[in-house]
């Protein structure tokens, strides 16, 4: 059986990789966290010492990495994928990064007669666990999209073809900016209502059956006790961290500057999450902890 390469076994990537295993894929994996790598080795996966080892062993590679510098290092570093990549290899990158980096890596892959597509994801840790993720794919052509879809559909349920390489990243940046704005809005709405004497569950129920309904309210409410089995009910542990949200909002602000498209609400959300990402109380917490931050501002 041919090997599928998987690089990045964190909160999202780990679950995604396991869904590939459940669907019969044989993996060769790499992550800087050696303890996690050993877990996958115990589950029957082959282990690579460097990303280059994965490229030498596989013509189908998935990467899920934290930021643009990580993507550059994994693909173009001294022991990176491009050192040993085989012609015809398809690289599917589900990282959330600057659009320009996606385009640069794609161009470098093409020079090596390989393909790089951006396929960022939405759906959170739960979506990664349950294989219900949405993939926003910039594949460049239909043939490449169909090849990628056969793999991505094992990890998600909505595989969306957005056309040119870079478009997936653009869509993800826009989506996550909206998510950050929504979470701040839901947190301040809940804080205001509770401060006015409303029961948290009752207020959430009204919002979720009215025009204010959104994912941050009806699925991922930041107030502890409103929804079970999400980070706000376990001290904001796990989930999508404040540092990652600050990073994604920074990407949106970079795009806003480059395109001269105004994003005033995105800018405000970015300022708030930059504060949280720098504060030891909040920096290791899920981004819903913005509710606790706002609550502490009550006079």
From Swiss-Prot:
NAD(+) binds at residues 2-30, 96, 247. One of its GO terms (molecular function) is 3-hydroxyisobutyrate dehydrogenase activity. It is found in: Mitochondrion. It catalyses: 3-hydroxy-2-methylpropanoate + NAD(+) = 2-methyl-3-oxopropanoate + NADH + H(+). Keywords: Branched-chain amino acid catabolism, Mitochondrion, NAD, Oxidoreductase. The active site is at 172. Pfam families: NAD_binding_11 (PF14833), NAD_binding_2 (PF03446). It is an enzyme of class 1 (oxidoreductase). One of its GO terms (biological process) is valine catabolic process. InterPro entries: 3-OH-isobutyrate_DH-rel_CS (IPR002204), 6-PGluconate_DH-like_C_sf (IPR008927), 6PGD_dom2 (IPR013328), 6PGDH_NADP-bd (IPR006115), HIBADH (IPR011548), HIBADH-like_NADP-bd (IPR029154), HIBADH-related (IPR015815), NAD(P)-bd_dom_sf (IPR036291). Its EC number is 1.1.1.31. PROSITE patterns: 3_HYDROXYISOBUT_DH. Belongs to the HIBADH-related family. 3-hydroxyisobutyrate dehydrogenase subfamily. This is Probable 3-hydroxyisobutyrate dehydrogenase, mitochondrial. The lineage of its organism: Eukaryota, Metazoa, Ecdysozoa, Nematoda, Chromadorea.
